[in-house]
Amino acid sequence: MVTVEEYRKAQRAEGPATILAIGTSTPSNCVDQSTYPDYYFRITNSEHKTELKEKFKRMCDKSMIKKRYMHLTEEILKENPNMCAYMAPSLDARQDIVVVEVPKLGKEAAQKAIKEWGQPKSKITHLVFCTTSGVDMPGCDYQLAKLLGLRPSVKRLMMYQQGCFAGGTVLRLAKDLAENNKGARVLVVCSEITAVTFRGPSESHLDSLVGQALFGDGAAAIIMGSDPIIGVERPLFELVSAAQTLVPDSEGAIDGHLREVGLTFHLLKDVPGLISKNIEKSLLEAFQPLGISDWNSLFWIAHPGGPAILDQVELKLGLKQEKLRATREVLSNYGNMSSACVLFILDEMRKASTKEGLGTTGEGLEWGVLFGFGPGLTVETVVLHSVAT
């Protein structure tokens, strides 16, 4: 008879959790940021609010976003006028859209990741699904498992309503699952659709307008596992450590409330200032054990909550401009897709690194950091190790 210790040892993987594939998807409807203010004020019947429209134009101009993708088309919004009002009961209409479309968008990203991975989907042992868009029972995890035809024995974990830091959270959870279950292959999916947050403008709620200027739709999927099969699976990044912390004195800095009117967002404090003031502490805790203190020696993946956050982090840490290139590229081409953003950035980085012949998946560098920022204020810090290209 085996002992508990022997059994536990046999259960655990030997090597670190490794990202083995990445896939992304967006709705087909692409929105040009330069013309979005005119469209937004027209579709919400707010063209008479000329001063507010000028403010919104400035927000869009400063956003550093060129385009975004949105499931909500003009046709859908015309069929659901309450979604175009500032605060009209509209949760049913919103939910009806997202409970179908969130798993569907997630499926597209997952299929791309599975194709790159090159293994049969029957080898997927765990599924982690994350969204801030829509709640049903059974949830998006169940719907996605059905859409993909995963085994009934797949161990599912559903994460709802976490917000923008959750791209880091899912990596932390998947890391623990992969490393503590020998042979586990974890499918992680973040799928976000702004149908829950879209609403008309109001002079009394400018922070809501900030969200309307920044948020976009997208889904990203990764396959994670330890001890990749040599010659069969191709590692992209290794996950070395993962931590979560609450920023001091930041309660109420970012709030979201799911009510009859949908999901409303409130930005109450200086979020970029709070993040930049506290980010070095997270970096020191993560990298001191590795003997790393030069932040420019790392490759960077930071959740692009908005350009102000990126600018202040750059300034505070003395980062060279190219450090946040992949992050800014994703913000420019997709907007803020909440939890999915950091996975899009990982994808952008490894593709650009290979294309430019930089030697590793992390822009030619060995060590990197991934940050998730969101409600709480919560900061997720993931230490990454790149792989030779």
From Swiss-Prot:
Catalytic activity annotation: (E)-4-coumaroyl-CoA + 3 malonyl-CoA + 3 H(+) = 2',4,4',6'-tetrahydroxychalcone + 3 CO2 + 4 CoA
Kindly list the GO molecular function terms attached to this UniProt entry: acyltransferase activity, transferring groups other than amino-acyl groups; naringenin-chalcone synthase activity
- Please name the top-level EC class of this enzyme: transferase
What are the entry keywords?
Acyltransferase, Flavonoid biosynthesis, Transferase
Q: Which GO terms describe its biological process?
A: flavonoid biosynthetic process; polyketide biosynthetic process
The active site is formed by 164
Q: Does the keyword Acyltransferase apply?
A: yes
UniProt EC number: 2.3.1.74
Membrane-traversing stretches: none
- InterPro entries according to UniProt: Chalcone/stilbene_synt_C, Chalcone/stilbene_synt_N, Chalcone/stilbene_synthase_AS, Polyketide_synthase_type-III, Thiolase-like
- The reply to whether Mitochondrion figures as a keyword in the UniProt entry is no
- Extract the coiled-coil ranges from the record: none
**Pfam families recorded for this chain?**
Chal_sti_synt_C (PF02797), Chal_sti_synt_N (PF00195)
| Pathway terms, separated by semicolons | Secondary metabolite biosynthesis; flavonoid biosynthesis
What functional role does this protein have?
Answer: The primary product of this enzyme is 4,2',4',6'-tetrahydroxychalcone (also termed naringenin-chalcone or chalcone) which can under specific conditions spontaneously isomerize into naringenin.
Protein family (similarity comment) = Belongs to the thiolase-like superfamily. Chalcone/stilbene synthases family.
What PANTHER family does this protein map onto? CHALCONE SYNTHASE 1, HYDROXYMETHYLGLUTARYL-COA SYNTHASE
Q: What is this protein called?
A: Chalcone synthase 1B
Q: Which organism is it from?
A: Solanum tuberosum
Lineage of the native species? Eukaryota, Viridiplantae, Streptophyta, Embryophyta, Tracheophyta
